[in-house]
UniProtKB/Swiss-Prot annotation:
Coiled-coil intervals, chain numbering: none
SUPFAM superfamilies reported in the protein's UniProt record: MFS general substrate transporter (SSF103473)
Family note: Belongs to the major facilitator superfamily. Proton-dependent oligopeptide transporter (POT/PTR) (TC 2.A.17) family.
Annotated Gene Ontology cellular component terms: membrane
Name of the molecule in the record: Protein NRT1/ PTR FAMILY 5.5
Subcellular location: Membrane
TM segment ranges: 3-23, 35-55, 62-82, 96-116, 134-154, 165-185, 279-299, 310-327, 356-376, 394-414, 440-460, 478-498
Topology in the lipid bilayer: Multi-pass membrane protein
Tissues where this protein is expressed: Expressed in roots.
Keywords from the named record: Membrane, Transmembrane, Transmembrane helix, Transport
Entry-linked InterPro entries: MFS_trans_sf, POT_fam
Primary localization: membrane
One annotated GO molecular function: transmembrane transporter activity
Length: 521
């Protein structure tokens, strides 16, 4: 499995520099190039949820890894052909877009299955205490770190872009052959169905009973008394979903139980309610997605027009990504440590009242990140103006961008980890992964929203803020606009969490006074 991770690292660094290919080689306006990158990143994020459903319900992780590796191999192969001298014009552009579409399948397939499949192998009873497996795991992690450094340093040194795109394709083919060679020894967990089906069933059952009058008598709601699963108490919120558990008087209970799409347990209804209650918090992910979209678009374009020398050495731009990734991993560890300390200090704290404190921290850091980026860009543009360097590299060190990249990595790590921990505490365990992926999808929508925001701001500014190149534009003003949006996002977070806390308190009071009579089977 390590070879798949190593190949993914090479692909990751190659895709991170896609903005430079579009502006330097295809000669696109930097806003058009950013739009293409944002659509690609957004689609790659949105597809996670649907792919997770396919993996759980039909495919399984082994075959998903095979599919994702094939997608990477063909996708980068198409990308290499589109960048080669043999193609030009519409054929080149068409194949380029096809390549990105195929690669996006590889991204969300690999992201979903690689970690889970690796854990399955480590937890396999045949491998417990096996020194060879442990050594292989350690070598895999060390090798991944080495590949990070090699990819960051070596990839930018390769001049022809079609060669840069060919290397990830070759790595994926090699990784596929090595991965398949051990297929007989892998532990494979068969797809057991998706827990998301429960949510669909509740919506379908409640919709089928829309014409039925709702009764406040909770004794008319169905629950399976001898079920091995935890039984969740009935709550008063989102009452329209309670119809899914209503026992109709026109049919016998035995007949209704046979159709699971028309009668659900109260516990299943309450699980669906817990999912819906967290959805408003996802609104904060839209603006966070806009901030995330800057790292491999506008920030990278700034770096491309700045002095990257460190002494006599030309600093490879992907090293900025390494600093950002290090900040992301470090901030995630801090979040985990803070969560453990909170659990020790406040063991009696009920899960329903916990709020994701890491999210407002990440939003505050977003405000700092965008404001710092605005100040740095203002300084850079001042150098451009005073020295007349509209078409030249600006004699200003790329290290000026380091704070905003480190902040961006910290924001990503804190936000992702805080949201994941929060969802683990507030939604059923089997659905928490889907909610995490739903949040990733909403972030993807936010990333693509950057396109609309750039278009809107460009129209309002009369085209002065966004011109052909970043040296002629006023991206610093755009960063200030995003800073204001982040401030609004912080206010939105407090409104949503306050509303969520109030609703939970009402549900808690209702549970004490609204005891149902369980319909025994």
């Amino acid at each position: 499995m390590s070879v798949l991770s190593w190949a993914f690292t090479v692909a990751w660094f190659t895709l991170w520099m896609l903005m430079l290919y579009l502006t330097n080689e295809m000669k696109l306006k930097f806003t058009d190039a950013a739009a293409i990158v944002n659509v690609f990143a957004g689609v790659s994020a949105i597809g996670h949820l649907g792919m997770q459903f396919l993996v759980d319900a039909f495919i399984g992780h082994f075959w998903m890894l095979c599919l994702s590796t094939l997608a990477f191999s063909f996708g980068f192969g198409f990308l290499a052909i589109s960048a080669s001298p043999i193609l030009s014009g519409n054929g080149q552009k068409g194949l380029f877009y096809v390549a990105l579409t195929v690669i996006s399948v590889g991204i969300f397939g690999r992201s979903i299955s690689l970690g889970v499949f690796t854990e399955d192998q480590l937890e396999d009873g045949r491998n417990k205490g096996n020194p060879a497996k442990l050594v292989s795991f350690v070598i895999g992690n060390v090798g991944n770190f080495v590949f990070l450094l090699l990819a960051a340093i070596a990839m930018p040194q390769i001049s022809p872009w079609f060669v840069r795109f060919t290397i990830p394709s070759g790595c994926e083919v090699l990784a596929m052959l090595i991965f398949i060679s051990g297929a007989c020894s892998y532990k494979r967990v068969k797809p057991g169905g998706s827990p998301l089906t429960t949510v669909f069933r509740v919506f379908m059952a409640s919709a089928s009973k829309m014409s039925c009058a709702y009764s406040n008598n909770s004794s008319q709601l169905y629950e399976k008394a001898e079920c091995d699963q935890d039984i969740k108490p009935h709550t008063s919120s989102l009452r329209y979903l309670d119809r899914a558990a209503m026992i109709l008087q026109t049919e016998s209970l035995e007949q209704q139980r046979k159709n699971r799409w028309k009668l659900c347990r109260v516990t299943e209804v309450e699980q669906t309610k817990s999912v819906i209650r967290t959805v408003p918090l996802f609104a904060t992910s839209l603006i966070s997605g806009i901030v995330f979209s800057l790292g491999n678009t506008f920030f990278l374009e700034q770096a491309n027009h700045m002095d990257s020398k460190f002494g006599s050495w030309n600093l490879p731009l992907p090293l900025l990504l390494l600093f950002s990734e290090a900040a992301r991993l470090g901030s995630r560890e801090l979040c985990v440590m803070a969560a453990k300390r909170h659990a020790i200090d406040f063991p009696e704290s009920p899960k329903q009242t916990k709020t994701p404190y890491g999210i407002p921290v990440s939003i505050i850091l977003s405000i700092f990140c965008c404001s710092i980026a605005a100040h740095v860009e203002s300084r850079r543009l001042k150098v451009v103006s005073t020295q007349g360097l509209l078409h030249e590299t600006v004699p200003m060190s790329v290290f000026w961008l380091l704070p905003q990249y480190i902040l961006l990595g910290s924001i990503t790590g804190i936000y992702e980890n805080s949201f994941a921990l929060y969802l683990e505490e507030t939604v059923p365990e089997e659905l928490s992964q889907y909610m995490v992926l739903l949040n990733v999808g909403v972030c993807g929508v936010g990333i693509m929203s950057n396109i609309a925001l750039v278009s809107l701001v460009g129209s309002v500014s009369g085209g002065k803020w966004f011109q052909d190149t970043i040296n002629k534009s006023r991206v610093d003003n755009y960063y200030w606009v995003i800073t204001v949006f982040c401030m609004f996002n912080l206010l939105l977070y407090f409104i949503v969490t306050y509303r969520y806390t109030v609703c939970n308190k009402k549900d808690g009071a209702t549970q004490e006074n609204d005891r149902r009579i369980i319909a025994s089977v």
